[in-house]
Amino acid sequence: MKKQRETEQQESVIAPRVGEPVAKKQTRKKLVKRILLGVLCFLLIAGGGIGWGMWSSRYPERINMGTSCNMEDMNMSDMGSMCQAGNSGSGTPIDTLQAPQTAAHIDTFTLTAQPAHLSFGSGNASDAWTFNGTSPGPTLHVRQGDLVIVHLVNHLSFGVTIHWHGITVPNSADGVAGVTQDAVKPGQTYTYRFLAKDAGTYWYHSHQESFEQTGHGLYGMVIVDPVISTVHDDVDTALALHTWNSNPILNGAMGTVHISAQSGQWVRLRLVNTDNYPYHLTLVGTPFLVAALDGHDINGPTPLTAVPLSIDGGQRYDLRFRMPENGPVALLIAKDGDQQYAKTPAVLVGQGQYVSSALPSLNQNEFNFATYGQPRTDPITLQSHFDATYTISLGFTIGFSNGRPGPVFTLNGKSFPNSPEIVVKPGQLIRLHFENNADSGIHPMHLHGHTLTVLTKNGRALAGSPVHLDTISVRPHESYDVAFYADNPGLWMLHCHNLYHANHGMDMMIVYPNISTPYAIGNASGNFPD
């Protein structure tokens, strides 16, 4: 009986009641059919739309980034129509864009990509991908003007490369999988060769699936000492900020890094953010100077006291200070989103007891390079003649990136490989206007192979020292104007150095005309730079 009642109830959902007019019965059936048909159509359209979105967003099997257009045919105000990539058979071969023959002193290194089980301290250990068994890998210390030769040996089970972040290498040594080389396969060796032209703090990391590989340990630092130094540092230490399993680590370890220094000595801390997200930091115990940004000296830096600094993905800060008579100097850090600095210092310089009872506030005005230091004459200014100016709008949407549903980060409304391409002619002075008008996060935009001169922040000219960067961080509702000389022919990436954003579309190319490459990005080649 119970089963019979259930059956009757189910039938009553679509069956007419006894005595109901025939017309009403037919109308009811039609209505049910229409509803079912509508639901079916909706599911087919939605499913088809999702399927089309996933399919159409996938990278082609092969994307060649070579260029084959003539500058005379290009409209310099329109990025989208300037030049078509995809010709690998004509033009200057990218492999010929190498460091010149030189009698300079040679520094030779071997970096072996290999797996390792690493201890990060405080009972934390994990499998990692490393250079020479450590993460960060060895710090490469060279002198300005030296010829640097690095042999990459791959003992991992997948392809890797090395990109020299911030160093103006020739294009063949840029280390971008699918653009300047194929990823180095397991068991293979590849050699990079470049001149260390500019003194400063730089770093290196894999640019094959860089979001995954850099995050899992394939990175290290490069220090280029100047031929003639204008200042003397008694203590000089490089420090790599990174995150492992959501825990901040410094030079591959949790806890406090201890650095020896005596009263009256000058100390330089070279801070490198190898992570995707910002770190907030400050020094307590003595006033400090911001001596350099992205490896380039600040003119006339002035003392700061416990001022917060924000260092975004890929950026570098050189901090200098003189050790006080009494007590240590502490570097405090906070991850983005933290309400205060960690009570345990990240770095402790000198002897004595550190007291954390009065942590400086994260809410006070943070360091602003646009007003820091002393003005001086610079080769590039707002009054310079610019051969071309381009606006790059940084955005965000929900959609598909290479077949994956989720966030998509865009440049002028498009994501890689459909993002706009800028073609520049050797000798031109190029102006870029970056704007972040959406709440799409912080975008540290990194240009390979060139140095950016910052002209304006939010429409206002810089009032302090000239600022030269390779990674310009654009926060929500900020804008910057920057400029660079097109003096390094090749095919160069411009991308967000939050590598998650780059991995989800925030990449574009700045290329010179008539450059050919035998390499390609995509499934057929196995090259995926981000």
Language model features with spans:
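Histidine- and aromatic-enriched segments that form or immediately flank copper-ligand environments
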Residues: 30-33, 50, 109-229, 278-309, ...
